[in-house]
């Protein structure tokens, strides 16, 4: 793909946009209209003589010149509706519509909008009568000293007065003397806010907000923020005054609310949204919204963008920004300083020659032109703001020093510029500040907020003997008040194990707390103890309030269910101990029983006693390391529908079914005296837990045909090909607890258990157990599990699960967004698919395709080709990982590397690629452009086996796509992608199922009709 892009505008911002767009390998030419001397002839960049005010003529120009994308720099064309007009004419245009651009073009609209959507801003009133405005200024109960022209005034329509009289004079100048023309027909009078002013910008596709690093502009002409207001005399980025946490707050409470609000009001906002923000003592407040890049903010933000700007803009227009989030250069600062003409912002001289460009560029600086023109082959001044000099270095001080060198090199008569750009950041950075606990990664305020949120949850678990009041050093429990006379105490501690990993992958944290409580209170119930109180331990690297609150809310609800108090706990934030998003849990329960009620009563247990099994809710919290391994090898993801017969839920939800708590239902039965022992079936399964409550001389014989085995166990056994012993030693197999009772009382106890709403069965009996004999024998287990997962028809077992011949293990190689990867992921989730994706490899880090894979629970690897001397070494590294994952088939989905001969030969007949044309026509990387230039009416896409010659492998499937009149590379590409998403999965299914094979003679063989 080799696109042509048109940038609208003539300033330093537009030169910067053109410079950044020209860096894209997908862009072959950037035209700028009307442009300046810097964009006249600079590599891919040149100026275009086309009227930008006549939108019809502009649209025709774009069609004639095959422009793929129009990028609008200044605000005036946006307010004039250029985006809507070009879009209606079939030209892709980056920026908000005129309706959405009212956020900038009408300050009155913007203020009303912010009030409607609770976006923090200064107090204000709008006026069309100057007398009313002045009356408000003198009577307002806040300092009403900021006067703004409501319309567009080239960034200069704001006057910050020092007194009420000065504010009233500003009103007169704007409304009566028309200092800003029609823009001042309505004025907005605002509260004067105090604090640091910063610029926070974002890309948005109308849903997703991708924030940029915060910047700070310098509006006043002279050092020390003296002199008149200008369009901006310099900027730096990132602004250290805006911490990461504060930027998140600004994103959520300002930028995202604005985007969501525009969507709700029927004017979806797409493009750049710029919020000018004051950092007040009451938090960030919006001063103004702009609907485009600021100038000079653009000149310091875009040099820090690592991503392809063209790609980001196209993804934004496609509504796919979430899959192509921009990546920024970290641990670097950018500074830009504006050089202006003498007399600016008033009258100034034009036509003054500028020298020193080679010297500035030799310093490694970027010089962006603004008010410049070419005259007799020389660069001369033609505007108030003439040049911006941008330096990027590892820190702000170094960037400032480099920018000053460029200013010294560039010369024109009467040049003025500020020498103190960044002075506020310098002062902020040099301010003596001792380290805080938060600097080390521990946020005490967040911890306090968590305690405040969970206090009512814990309070609700109070019970006789304990009134919960979090915040003390320890908790107290009054055994006497709880009704105990001669008690023994029992305690137990446990965790949830790697079930946590699944909860974190599924982003489902509300049920894991019940697992923690259940594991502890069920253990002490085995001693006959009533659970009295519970304490939790939650540890993480970075406290996420919503996640932690969800976990602890689950713990509190489980404590209420168990009848114990959530007496306290510990939330430990330990930076660098855990990866982002991960946490660990541990619990501690204390219970009590009267001395004569202690279990197990070993002396009472005799041969012939009955074993009653109480149903589990599912897997409970054991065996999850094996479960995760089985899922990894299976054709399902955690987000896939659960196997047949397991309910209308995802596999992740099925596996996260919380552990059953037995204390409330079984404690009265245990206290009746009829129960001799209670075994909690936890780690070690049936084989290792029941013997823990039996005398050494006894064991048990169990019959699995007597109880209901949940279908999840059948799926695990079949998918993992697990042996009967492995099942019995790892899982509870449907029995969460076992009671030992006298044979003659079994029927009564079983009746009582069922009356307490527990599902239960007599599942076996106590038997004598000679030394060295198995203490638990389970008959009919594998038969019951397999029958349970199958349907019997005509005397044969038919699987009720999508168990089929072994599925092909697929690896997908990517370099970018991975839209075809998503199609492959979606198709292989189908239970009928003959393949499943086990690995995604990218030769580039931080690309959207990796995020797609991780969201689907697919392992990923990044193998950077730049770290290898040649293609063969890189391919060997890839091959090693493919072998590690036992890959059968390789799919190339936007993988931008030519593979070496040895690698291709090894994977001959097992490696698929998709090409965006009907091969053998239009080979190579710019197929769509070739199609359009050839004037054909049909194109399409082709899935083929990979051969050593590029795009020359045997064809598996093709799909035709019409070429329509007026198509651009972008529109044609989108239409072809739809076809790609259809036939790539279909071709993979053909190869994985064996329907299509590559013969030894290099020809396609169809094993069966499709």
UniProtKB/Swiss-Prot annotation:
Region listing for GART domain, in residue ranges: 810-1010
Domain ATP-grasp: 111-318
Positions of modified residues (N-acetylalanine): 2
EC number: 6.3.4.13, 6.3.3.1, 2.1.2.2
GO annotations of cellular component type: cytosol
Domain of life: Eukaryota
Region named AIRS domain: 434-809
Gene Ontology MF terms: ATP binding; metal ion binding; phosphoribosylamine-glycine ligase activity; phosphoribosylformylglycinamidine cyclo-ligase activity; phosphoribosylglycinamide formyltransferase activity
One Pfam family matching this protein: AIRS
Pathway: Purine metabolism; IMP biosynthesis via de novo pathway; 5-amino-1-(5-phospho-D-ribosyl)imidazole from N(2)-formyl-N(1)-(5-phospho-D-ribosyl)glycinamide: step 2/2; Purine metabolism; IMP biosynthesis via de novo pathway; N(1)-(5-phospho-D-ribosyl)glycinamide from 5-phospho-alpha-D-ribose 1-diphosphate: step 2/2; Purine metabolism; IMP biosynthesis via de novo pathway; N(2)-formyl-N(1)-(5-phospho-D-ribosyl)glycinamide from N(1)-(5-phospho-D-ribosyl)glycinamide (10-formyl THF route): step 1/1
Site description Raises pKa of active site His, residues in chain: 951
Positions that bind (6R)-10-formyltetrahydrofolate: 871, 896-899, 913, 947-951
Residues bound to N(1)-(5-phospho-beta-D-ribosyl)glycinamide: 818-820, 977-980
Family per record: In the N-terminal section; belongs to the GARS family. In the central section; belongs to the AIR synthase family.
Domain description: The N-terminal ATP-grasp domain carries the phosphoribosylamine--glycine ligase activity. The central AIRS domain carries the phosphoribosylformylglycinamidine cyclo-ligase activity.
Role, per record: Trifunctional enzyme that catalyzes three distinct reactions as part of the 'de novo' inosine monophosphate biosynthetic pathway.
Subunit relationships: Homodimer.
Name of the protein in its database record: Trifunctional purine biosynthetic protein adenosine-3
Origin species: Mus musculus (Mouse)
């Amino acid at each position: 793909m080799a696109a042509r892009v048109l940038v609208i505008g003539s300033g330093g911002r537009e030169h910067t946009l053109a410079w950044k767009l020209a860096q894209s390998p997908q862009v072959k030419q950037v035209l700028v209209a009307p442009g300046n001397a810097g964009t006249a002839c600079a590599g891919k960049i040149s100026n275009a003589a086309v009227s930008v005010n006549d939108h019809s003529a502009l649209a025709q120009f774009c069609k004639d010149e095959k422009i793929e994308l129009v990028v609008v720099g200044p605000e005036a064309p946006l307010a004039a509706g250029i985006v809507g007009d070009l879009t209606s004419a079939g030209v892709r245009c980056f920026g908000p519509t005129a309706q959405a651009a009212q956020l900038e073009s009408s300050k009155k609209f913007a203020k009303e909008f912010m009030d409607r959507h609770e976006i923090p801003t200064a107090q204000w009133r709008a006026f069309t009568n100057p007398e009313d405005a002045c009356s408000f200024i003198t009577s307002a109960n806040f300092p009403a000293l900021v006067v703004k022209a409501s319309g567009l005034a080239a960034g200069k329509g704001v006057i910050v007065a020092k007194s009420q009289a000065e504010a009233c004079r500003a009103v007169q100048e704007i409304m009566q003397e028309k200092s800003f023309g029609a823009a001042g027909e309505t004025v907005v009078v605002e509260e004067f806010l105090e604090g640091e002013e910063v610029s926070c910008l974002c890309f948005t596709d109308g849903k997703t907000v991708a924030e940029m690093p915060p910047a700070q502009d310098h509006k006043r002409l002279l050092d020390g923020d003296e002199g008149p207001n200008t369009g901006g005399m310099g900027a730096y980025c990132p602004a250290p005054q805006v911490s990461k946490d504060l930027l998140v707050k600004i994103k959520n409470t300002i930028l995202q609310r604005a985007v969501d609000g525009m969507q709700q009001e029927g004017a979806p906002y797409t493009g750049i949204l710029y919020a000018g923000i004051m950092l007040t003592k009451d938090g960030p407040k919006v001063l103004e919204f702009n609907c485009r890049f600021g100038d000079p903010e653009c000149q310091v933000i875009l040099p820090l963008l690592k991503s392809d700007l063209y790609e980001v803009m196209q993804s934004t227009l496609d509504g796919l920004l979430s899959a192509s989030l921009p990546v920024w250069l970290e641990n670097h600062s950018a500074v830009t300083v504006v050089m202006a003409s003498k007399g600016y912002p008033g009258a100034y001289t034009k036509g003054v020659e500028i020298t020193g460009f080679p010297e500035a560029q030799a310093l490694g600086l970027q010089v962006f032109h603004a008010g410049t023109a070419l005259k007799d082959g020389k660069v001369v001044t033609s505007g108030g703001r003439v040049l911006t000099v941008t330096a990027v270095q590892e820190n702000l001080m170094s960037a400032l020093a480099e920018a000053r060198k460029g200013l010294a090199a560039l010369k024109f008569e009467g040049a003025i510029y500020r020498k103190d750009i960044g002075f506020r950041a310098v002062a902020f950075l040099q301010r003596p500040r001792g380290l805080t606990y938060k600097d080390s990664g521990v946020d005490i305020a967040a911890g306090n907020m968590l305690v405040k949120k969970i206090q009512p949850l814990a309070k609700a678990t109070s019970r006789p003997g304990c009134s919960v009041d979090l915040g003390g050093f320890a908790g107290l429990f009054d055994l006497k008040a709880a009704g105990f006379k001669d008690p023994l105490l029992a305690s137990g501690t446990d965790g949830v194990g790697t079930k946590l990993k699944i909860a974190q992958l599924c982003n489902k944290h509300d049920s894991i707390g019940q697992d923690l409580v259940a594991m502890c209170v069920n253990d002490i119930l085995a001693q006959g103890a009533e659970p009295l109180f519970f304490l939790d331990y939650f540890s993480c690297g970075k406290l996420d309030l919503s996640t932690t609150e969800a976990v602890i809310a689950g713990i509190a609800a489980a404590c209420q269910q168990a009848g114990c108090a959530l007496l306290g706990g510990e939330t430990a934030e330990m930076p660098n101990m855990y990866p982002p998003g991960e946490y660990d849990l541990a619990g501690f329960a204390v219970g009590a029983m009267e001395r004569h009620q202690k279990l197990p009563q070993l002396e009472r247990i005799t041969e012939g006693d009955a074993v009653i099994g109480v149903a589990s809710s599912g897997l409970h919290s054991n065996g999850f390391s094996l479960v995760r391994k089985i899922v990894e090898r299976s054709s399902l993801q955690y987000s896939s529908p659960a196997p047949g017969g397991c309910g209308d839920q995802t596999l992740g939800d099925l596996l996260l079914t919380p552990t059953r708590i037995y204390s409330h239902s079984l404690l009265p039965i245990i206290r009746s005296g009829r129960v001799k022992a209670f075994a909690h079936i936890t780690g070690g399964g049936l084989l290792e837990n029941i013997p823990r409550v039996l005398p050494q001389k006894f064991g048990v014989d169990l019959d699995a045909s007597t109880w209901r085995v949940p279908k999840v166990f059948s799926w695990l056994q079949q998918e993992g090909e697990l042996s009967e012993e492995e099942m019995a030693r790892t899982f509870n197999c449907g029995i969460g607890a076992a009671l030992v009772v006298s044979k003659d009382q079994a029927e009564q106890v079983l009746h009582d258990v069922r009356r307490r709403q527990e599902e239960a069965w007599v599942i076996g009996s106590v038997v004598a157990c000679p030394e060295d004999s198995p203490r638990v024998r389970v008959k009919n287990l594998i038969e019951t599990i397999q029958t349970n997962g199958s349907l019997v028809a005509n005397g044969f077992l038919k699987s009720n699960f999508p168990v089929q011949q072994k599925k092909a293990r697929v690896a997908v190689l990517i370099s970018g967004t991975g839209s075809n990867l998503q199609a492959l992921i979606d198709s292989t989730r189908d239970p009928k698919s003959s393949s499943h994706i086990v690995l995604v490899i990218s030769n580039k880090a931080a690309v959207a395709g990796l995020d797609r894979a991780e969201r689907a629970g697919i392992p990923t690897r990044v193998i950077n080709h730049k770290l290898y001397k040649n293609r063969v070494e890189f391919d060997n590294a890839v091959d090693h990982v493919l072998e590690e994952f036992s890959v059968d088939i390789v799919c190339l989905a936007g993988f931008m590397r030519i593979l070496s001969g040895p690698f291709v030969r090894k994977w001959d007949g097992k490696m698929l690629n998709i090409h965006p044309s009907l091969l053998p026509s239009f080979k190579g990387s710019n197929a769509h452009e070739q199609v359009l230039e050839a004037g054909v009416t049909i194109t399409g896409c082709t899935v083929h086996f990979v051969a050593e010659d590029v795009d020359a492998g045997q064809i598996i499937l093709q799909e035709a796509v019409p070429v329509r009149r007026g198509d651009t590379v972008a529109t044609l590409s989108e239409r072809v992608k739809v076809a790609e998403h259809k036939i790539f999965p279909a071709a993979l299914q053909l190869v994985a199922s064996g329907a299509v094979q590559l013969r030894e003679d290099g020809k396609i063989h169809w094993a069966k009709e499709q």
